[in-house]
């Protein structure tokens, strides 16, 4: 069932590659299946296409952590802090700061 949803999202992205809502949905479906490398790639494309409020940076950072890419995760958290503060989400920024402190 989840694979079918991923196939549908991929077809929709193929038809409309600049639709950030669809791309974010695909990334979330990939995360559910623990397909972290693919999810990270989709999140990076998503972030290059839109002014995210911070949530996607957090998802990307956590995904990169799971992949053992700590420096990239650190950068994603830092970008997430900037985005969260810019969009008036100090609680999210604080969560990312704590996650940064916990990175090895």
Segments the model singles out, each with a brief description of its role:
Residues 15, 49, 83-87:
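Structural marker of alpha-solenoid helical repeat scaffolds
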